[in-house]
Design a protein with these regions (language model features):
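A short beta-strand-loop element at or near the start of a globular domain
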Residues: 15-65
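Residue-level detector of buried hydrophobic side-chain packing
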Residues: 42-43, 56-58, 74, 117, ...
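Short, flexible loop/turn elements at secondary-structure junctions
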Residues: 47, 62, 121-123, 144, ...
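Residues that flank catalytic or metal-binding motifs in active/ligand-binding sites
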Residues: 37-39, 68-70, 113, 136, ...
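Intrinsically disordered, compositionally biased repeat/linker segments
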Residues: 55, 171-196
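Beta-strand-rich interaction/scaffold domains
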Residues: 3-23, 62-134
Length: 196
C-alpha cells in the first residue's frame, strides 16, 4: 500500500465561486450561502488507473469560529486531469462532476482542529477513467447545499493549517504476502521465502 499526502502549492490550487459566478483565488475559501462553491486541486496524484483506492480523505480547517458551519456536497471533477483554477467566470461550476458525492454537514466545528471528509468513491471514480495516468491532477468540488452553509476554509494563501488530501492505494502486484511469492522446497509443506 502507498499513502500519498497532497497539499496545495499555489494560489491557483484552491478557489471559491460566488452566486454571481465570480471566482476568487487569493483568499480563504468562503462558502457562505446556498449558491457558493469551493474548488480544491490536488496536484500530481501518483496512483495509476489500475490502482485500488483503499481510502481517500479530505482534511480541512475552518479559519474562524464565526464561520464554521459546513453544509456541502463534495464531488470530484470528472476529468482525466484537472486544470488549475482561474478567475474566469464560473470556473468551478462549469466543471463536470462525478456521480459519487459525500454530504458534509455539521455546526460549530471550531477552528483549531481538522475536519475529515471521506472522498474515497470520488477519487476511485476519477482514477478509473480511461485517460487517467499517474501524475495527473485531481480536483474536489464543494457545493453549498443550503443557506445554512457558513464555512470559511483555510487555503494556500492562509499561510498555515491548510487543507490536504490523503490517498491510500494499492497497485496491482504489490502488498502480496511473502509466503505467496516464495518457492516450494522439497519436503516442506509451506513456501520457503527467498533469502537475500
Amino acid at each position: 500500500m502507498t499513502l500519498q499526502t497532497i497539499n496545495p502549492s499555489a494560489s491557483s490550487h484552491d478557489a471559491w465561486e460566488s452566486g454571481a459566478a465570480a471566482v476568487t483565488l487569493t483568499d480563504e475559501v468562503k462558502v457562505t450561502s446556498g449558491t457558493a462553491w469551493a474548488g480544491l486541486l490536488a496536484p500530481s496524484v501518483t496512483a495509476t488507473k489500475l490502482a485500488t483506492i483503499n481510502s481517500a480523505t479530505l482534511y480541512y480547517q475552518a479559519s474562524a469560529t464565526t464561520h464554521d458551519d459546513p453544509d456541502l456536497d463534495w464531488y470530484a471533477q470528472a476529468a482525466d486531469t484537472a486544470a488549475v483554477f482561474t478567475t474566469g467566470a464560473s470556473n468551478i461550476t462549469s466543471r463536470s462532476r462525478t456521480t459519487a458525492v459525500t454530504q458534509d454537514t455539521a455546526t460549530s466545528i471550531g477552528n483549531s482542529t481538522y475536519r475529515s471528509v471521506n472522498v474515497t468513491a470520488q477519487v476511485a471514480e476519477v482514477v478509473a477513467r480511461s485517460g487517467w495516468v499517474s501524475g495527473n491532477n485531481l480536483a474536489l468540488i464543494g457545493d453549498a447545499r443550503s443557506g445554512s452553509c457558513d464555512l470559511w476554509m483555510r487555503s494556500y494563501d492562509s499561510g498555515g493549517a491548510v487543507w490536504y488530501l490523503e490517498i491510500d492505494y494499492t497497485e496491482p502486484g504489490t502488498g502480496q504476502p511473502m509466503a505467496a511469492r516464495g518457492r516450494q522446497v522439497p519436503g516442506m509443506r509451506r513456501p520457503h521465502g527467498h533469502q537475500g
